[in-house]
């Protein structure tokens, strides 16, 4: 089988959390373009339904929308059950939901800290382990987690200690699960995007000064685009990545090289 065929996801089933918009929307689109049926999982069900409709019309794949609070164990279990029942199985997933709260550490409240850790790290544990249980009992699968270059470096000038810590945690969780499940044919990897020009970032006037600083610091001199993450996730979900597990892929335009 040639490499292009090995990259295909024909007949496979999966889901993406935080997929109504931004990075998750693009990775869900990528999976569908590669031949998979995909569930768009998000708390904002109205936008998720619109996204599902757009992807289904563009790709001809079965795309469903599911409302889910990824920090709630029962809700995540219900979501995974729905994916399996409506799509007919579960071969891959992308745990992508996340938030960021910028505040100096000495001013950040404990509630703010817990909110970031809960959404960015605890939800990944729930998503991975609940999806993983199904995969472990059904021959294997591929799990992809969204970490961040913020797990490798300390971002400046914005203070975001909770976000940085949560993403470092995602990377170590990824490695831990990869080792535990390696012999059971469940692969677990993470992607660490740099500054990505999602709609929420580029449409916010108050972020323009920050974007200018980020671009000035970046070797490529620009933000990444969500579409530039599509190739890596398809690779990780596919048979082309059969020997790839426990790895973190930094896609940051060389931002973390210095």
Name every feature range the model reports, one short phrase each.
Residues 2-6, 234, 245-258:
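Short C-terminal tail/terminal secondary-structure segment
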Residues 8-38:
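Canonical Rossmann dinucleotide-binding motif of NAD(H)/NADP(H)-dependent dehydrogenases/reductases
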Residues 104-105, 109-117, 159, 214:
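Substrate-binding pocket helix/loop in short-chain dehydrogenase/reductase
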Residues 128, 166, 174:
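Active-site helix of classical SDR
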Residues 133, 179-183, 242:
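Alpha-helical segment proximal to the catalytic Tyr-Lys
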Residues 148:
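Residue(s) in the substrate-gating loop at a strand-loop-helix junction
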Residues 218-229, 240:
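A conserved structural motif in NAD(P)-dependent oxidoreductases
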């Amino acid at each position: 089988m040639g490499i292009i065929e090995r990259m295909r996801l024909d007949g496979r089933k999966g889901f993406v959390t935080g997929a109504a918009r931004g990075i998750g929307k693009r990775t869900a689109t990528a999976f569908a373009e590669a031949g998979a049926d995909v569930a768009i999982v998000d708390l904002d069900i109205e936008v998720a339904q619109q996204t599902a409709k757009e992807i289904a019309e563009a790709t001809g794949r079965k795309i469903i929308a599911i409302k889910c609070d990824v920090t709630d164990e029962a809700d995540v279990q219900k979501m995974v059950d729905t994916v399996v029942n409506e799509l007919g199985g579960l071969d891959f997933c992308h745990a992508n939901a996340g938030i960021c709260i910028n505040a100096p550490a000495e001013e950040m409240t404990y509630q703010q800290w817990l909110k970031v850790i809960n959404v960015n790290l605890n939800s990944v544990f729930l998503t991975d382990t609940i999806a993983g249980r199904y995969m472990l009992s059904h021959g294997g699968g591929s799990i992809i987690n969204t970490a961040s270059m913020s797990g490798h470096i300390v971002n400046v000038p914005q203070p975001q200690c909770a976000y940085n810590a949560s993403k470092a945690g995602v990377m170590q969780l990824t490695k831990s699960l990869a080792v535990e499940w390696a012999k059971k044919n469940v692969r677990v990897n993470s992607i660490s995007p740099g500054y990505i020009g999602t709609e929420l970032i580029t449409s916010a006037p108050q972020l323009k000064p920050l974007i200018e600083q980020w671009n000035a610091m970046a070797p490529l001199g620009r933000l990444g685009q969500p579409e530039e993450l599509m190739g890596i996730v398809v690779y990780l979900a596919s048979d082309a990545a059969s020997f790839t597990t426990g790895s973190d892929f930094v896609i940051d335009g060389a931002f973390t090289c210095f």
